[in-house]
């Protein structure tokens, strides 16, 4: 079957989904979560095949981490589906309701987008997360994962499709593209009369490819070059906690810290404590001359280091004379993803928040909270640094649009 035929089937199934009640969608998502539990052994076995093949190819640590499913991670995926199931249904929400002077009633109502294409690599959890969010919002979803996760994605999709069938919903509402040729992906991205939105998740190369070749709208973020600025008034212990969690808890995540900026007035107190905590987590440090004056044992940082998304246990450090210099650095090297300030000065916190255009800005909180689940959205479908209808971590509302519904009693304009 051609990719266009698959997309047309998904569009027809999306029409069925759009008519389901909130209760029916909740029951469906709970059944999908249960299907993952039922098929857990097969899913983990399939994932192990993918991981083994990736290791044989010499895949890097960051990609391997994203690819790997453990029993705990798979359980967390099911838990995320259950969280999405009980979230308020955005479809049908009325966001405006007023009566015009001529008596017509004007409402703005949330409706599904239609068909969403997810293009991703080495992230089998996205198969379930994306399906759950799209279906909850009444959309069909076309999933095109990477070849490195094909066995994992297929096992997850089969479990979820079984739940759809048993609920009387066409399984085409969740369509997994098994033809992984690049030409097929290109054809999918050209289907502007069928596909309403494409969301790429993966490496910068994949995301740029999708953005450059798609004829459908694309919501994306290229990379996550996230910063922590430690202000002169920062609590040292607090800032160290933010740094270690942001850098070392899961360095392959796009919300992990890549660069540390330290105010010169606190550098001699903060940097030794930070270095000791990071060395305990095997983090490689690279710094500018002012940083190396305090930490002479670390390597010199290059200009490329400050622009890098390491996705690894590597951190670039720079000492700055003031907040304005820190903000200028972030504007030059940042990716509009997530930025953090550690400070006890409210005015500096407010300046930091108001001066940056990043999708998420944090004060005295870890960058790792830049996640749909942590921000109360349920499982996220992606993070947008595209200033369109959604900005930042994207949950259910980002998968709907508002339309006008007008009710009258025969009013005419002229």
Swiss-Prot record:
Recorded GO CC terms: cytoplasm
Pathway the protein acts in: Amino-acid biosynthesis; L-proline biosynthesis; L-glutamate 5-semialdehyde from L-glutamate: step 2/2
First-level EC class: oxidoreductase
Enzyme Commission number(s) from the entry: 1.2.1.41
Localization terms from the record: Cytoplasm
Annotated GO MF terms: glutamate-5-semialdehyde dehydrogenase activity; NADP binding
Keywords carried by this UniProt record: Amino-acid biosynthesis, Cytoplasm, NADP, Oxidoreductase, Proline biosynthesis
Classification via InterPro entries: Ald_DH/histidinol_DH (IPR016161), Ald_DH_C (IPR016163), Ald_DH_N (IPR016162), Aldehyde_DH_dom (IPR015590), G-glutamylP_reductase_CS (IPR020593), Glu-5-SA_DH (IPR012134), GPR_dom (IPR000965)
Gene Ontology biological process: L-proline biosynthetic process
Gene3D superfamilies the UniProt entry points to: Aldehyde Dehydrogenase, Chain A, domain 1, Aldehyde Dehydrogenase, Chain A, domain 2
Reaction(s) catalysed by this chain's protein: L-glutamate 5-semialdehyde + phosphate + NADP(+) = L-glutamyl 5-phosphate + NADPH + H(+)
NCBIfam families: PRK00197.1 (NF001221), proA (TIGR00407)
Record family assignment: Belongs to the gamma-glutamyl phosphate reductase family.
Function text: Catalyzes the NADPH-dependent reduction of L-glutamate 5-phosphate into L-glutamate 5-semialdehyde and phosphate. The product spontaneously undergoes cyclization to form 1-pyrroline-5-carboxylate.
Protein known as: Gamma-glutamyl phosphate reductase
Organism: Xanthomonas campestris pv. campestris (strain 8004)
UniProt gene name: proA
């Amino acid at each position: 079957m051609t990719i266009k035929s698959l997309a047309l089937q998904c569009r027809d199934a999306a029409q069925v989904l759009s008519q389901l009640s909130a209760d029916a969608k909740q029951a469906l998502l709970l059944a999908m979560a249960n299907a993952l539990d039922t098929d857990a052994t097969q899913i983990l076995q399939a994932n192990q095949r993918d991981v083994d093949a990736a290791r044989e190819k010499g895949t890097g640590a960051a990609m391997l981490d994203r690819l790997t499913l453990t029993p705990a991670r798979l359980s967390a995926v099911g838990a995320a589906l259950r969280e999405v199931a009980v979230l308020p249904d955005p479809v049908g929400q009325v966001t405006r309701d007023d009566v015009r002077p001529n008596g017509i009633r004007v409402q703005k109502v949330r409706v599904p987008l239609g068909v969403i294409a997810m293009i991703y690599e080495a992230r089998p959890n996205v198969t379930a997360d994306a399906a759950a969010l799209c279906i909850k919002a009444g959309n069909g979803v076309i999933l095109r994962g990477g070849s490195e996760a094909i066995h994992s994605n297929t096992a997850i999709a089969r479990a979820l499709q079984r739940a759809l069938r048993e609920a009387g919903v066409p399984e085409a509402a969740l369509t997994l593209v098994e033809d992984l040729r690049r030409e097929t992906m290109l054809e999918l991205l050209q289907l502007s009369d069928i596909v309403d939105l494409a969301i790429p998740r993966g490496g910068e190369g994949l995301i740029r490819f999708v953005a450059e070749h798609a004829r459908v709208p694309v919501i994306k973020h290229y990379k996550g070059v996230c910063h922590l600025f430690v202000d002169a008034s920062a609590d040292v212990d607090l800032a160290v906690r933010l740094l270690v969690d942001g850098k070392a808890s899961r360095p392959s995540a796009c919300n992990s810290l890549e660069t540390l900026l330290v105010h010169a007035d606190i550098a001699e107190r903060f940097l030794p404590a930070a270095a000791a905590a990071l060395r305990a987590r095997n983090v490689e440090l690279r710094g500018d001359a002012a940083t190396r004056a305090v930490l002479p044992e670390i390597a010199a940082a290059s200009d490329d280091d400050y622009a890098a998304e390491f996705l690894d246990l590597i951190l670039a450090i720079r000492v700055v004379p003031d907040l304005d210099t820190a903000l200028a650095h972030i504007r030059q090297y940042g990716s509009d993803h997530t930025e953090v300030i550690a400070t006890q000065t409210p005015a500096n916190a407010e300046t930091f928040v108001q001066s940056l255009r990043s999708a998420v800005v944090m004060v005295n909180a870890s960058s790792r909270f830049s996640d749909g689940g942590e921000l109360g959205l349920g499982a996220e479908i992606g993070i947008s640094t595209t200033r369109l209808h959604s900005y930042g971590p994207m949950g259910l509302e980002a998968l709907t649009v508002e339309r006008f519904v007008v009710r009258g009693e025969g009013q005419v304009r002229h």
